A protein has these predicted regions:
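Alpha-helical segment of the N-proximal tetratricopeptide repeat
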Residues: 7-44, 55, 61
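Generic helix N-cap/helix-start motif at coil->alpha-helix transitions
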Residues: 12-19, 46-53, 80-88, 115-124, ...
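TPR/TPR-like (Sel1-like) alpha-helical repeat modules
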Residues: 78-83, 111-112, 141, 145, ...
Length: 229
């Protein structure tokens, strides 16, 4: 991003950088209106800077405005020459209901040249499209990429587990949810909760700072012991 901003004046570059930092922070906090305001300001001040257009596209994507997101991602691709947003472009086509177009884009030559982590994200999106089409077997095949056998791919393992579950292959699904949970150091998924559901363990959500209380002994329960007439 710093390299991209060097095309701007020093004062403008500093201002745009601050807006981009705010976009990232506000997206993390899910304050989408404020994030959009900062992203739009960044684009007004630096419309030819890929990072600014990408920020605007990301806010649009997160808020479900897939047409606008797709337009911004295409602009980033055109002015930067990078295909790293291709998985999000495919998912935006999916969000617009254009599933055939999404699959065509996912099978493009550019998609085949994506680096490993982008291929993972694309595989997850394509699998979701296949499930949208009712093609659950094809959805599973879409996830069977080399990265599936490698560690530290919690989202890929999770998607594979969920698809296996959709096929009624519960034991295999449990194994892959466990792999996802073991790899998920950053809590990107709810694999642990899915495992507990499969194992029939009830999960109680506590508010921050609360602790689960042990049941009272019989003599201290209401209506027992000293309270009994």
């Amino acid at each position: 991003v710093h390299q991209q901003l060097r095309t701007l004046s020093k004062e403008n570059a500093e201002g745009v950088a601050q807006h981009l930092v705010m976009v990232a922070a506000l997206l993390e906090a899910e304050e989408f209106d404020a994030a959009m305001a900062h992203a739009e300001t960044a684009v007004r001040r630096a419309g030819r800077v890929p990072a600014a257009r990408e920020a605007l596209g990301m806010v649009a994507y997160r808020t479900g405005d897939f047409a606008r997101a797709l337009g911004e991602f295409r602009t980033v691709r055109r002015i930067s020459g990078s295909d790293h947003l291709l998985p999000l472009m495919v998912d935006s086509e999916r969000g617009l209901g254009r599933l055939d177009r999404a699959l065509d884009l996912a099978q493009s030559p550019e998609a085949k040249r994506l680096p490993a982590q982008d291929r993972v994200e694309l595989a997850i999106v394509v699998s979701g499209i296949r499930r949208d089409l009712g093609q659950t077997d094809a959805a599973l095949v879409a996830l069977q990429i080399p990265e599936l056998k490698r560690p530290k791919q919690p989202r890929l393992a999770y998607a594979y587990a969920d698809t296996l579950l959709g096929l009624g292959r519960d034991e295999e699904a449990r194994e892959w949810f466990q792999r996802a949970a073991d790899a998920d150091e950053d809590y990107e998924t709810d694999a642990v909760e899915r495992l507990e559901e499969l194992d029939g363990i009830a999960v109680t959500d506590l508010l921050p700072g609360e602790e689960e209380l042990a049941p009272l002994p019989p003599e201290e329960r209401t209506g027992d012991g000293a309270d009994r007439a």
